[in-house]
Amino acid sequence: MEGLHIFNGFSGSSEARARHAAHQLGIPLHVADVTETFDEEIVQYLTREYLVARTPNPCVVCNRKIKFKTLLYYADRLACHFVATGHYARVFHNRQTGRYALLRGLDQAKDQSYFLFLLGQEQLSRILFPLGELTKKEVRSVALTMGVEAVREKESQEICFIPDDDYKTFIERHMGSSPAIPGDIVDRSGRLLGSHNGIHSFTIGQRKGLHIAAPRPYYVLAIDREKNRVVVGHEEEQGFSGLIVSGVSWIDGESPREEVFETLVRIRYRHRGVSSVVCPLSAGDEICPATGRPADHEEAGDKLIIRFQEPQRAVAPGQAAVFYSDDRVIGGGWIEQGIPLD
């Protein structure tokens, strides 16, 4: 068994903790410096998405383009067939079909399968998730029994490379030649309610930081990039009946046989999921809910329409929509547009 620490340029003291854990386990530790690739694939992606009024999901992209790619590269160099990570998820191998399924972790409160929907069959065939069958409490107990003291540290809920979870400052530091442009904050009727210092500071469903003096709280309903304005409304105005996704990826490598099917859709990490109907957005014969007119070929592409069985809040373009059948991840895609309630 070999250990690997992936250094992304922001890891701080994590390498020292990794070395200490490797020493306690009695295994060698290798260090992969992915600083340059991480900046290109993750930091620039995150900054670019916020600047075009989308809410990125760097953890999903990192798992596909950085973490597992690096792990498997080093595994090949070290003649190791399998790689293991601390994700709370499970992999099931169907020996009859030869296919691999990605399942939720047994600890539903810690399940991380949402972040792994871009993994494919080749990757899943070599991945082990030993924590997937355990609860967080059981993991701590086993680790302490083995003498791994790192589990005593407070668990961070922040993105690993953004200090103090301060997205605004981080983005402004990496914007380069794309300065933030001040604009208006308006309600759905266009009534001016306030001003902002750049749309990169906002995401759908946001309540804090609007600085609007009003007897009732406002929430971000939409971010209008073309007019450089933030549209807000009250809680009852936040409902969405569905969404459109693009860049769809299927765990099996193939889409479901049924063109229209029912599934559970999660639209963010802490979202419990909503029963939904999924169907393709077809050019010409389908009204695009985002525009109110027939979709053209460019708009349709490989996009899907998801219709919620119950209205949902905070459908943020740029986030992942992940499809489940019970505990099994079917696939997912990127939210292009929420469909407001009529």
UniProtKB/Swiss-Prot annotation:
Cross-referenced CDD domains: MnmA_TRMU-like
Pfam families: tRNA_Me_trans (PF03054), tRNA_Me_trans_C (PF20258), tRNA_Me_trans_M (PF20259)
Principal location: cytoplasm
Disulfide cysteine pairs (residue numbers): C62-C160
Region feature Interaction with tRNA, mapped onto this chain: 110-112, 268-269
GO molecular function, one term: tRNA-uridine 2-sulfurtransferase activity
GO biological process, alphabetically ordered: tRNA wobble position uridine thiolation
Recorded GO CC terms: cytoplasm
Family that this chain belongs to: Belongs to the MnmA/TRMU family.
Protein name: tRNA-specific 2-thiouridylase MnmA 2
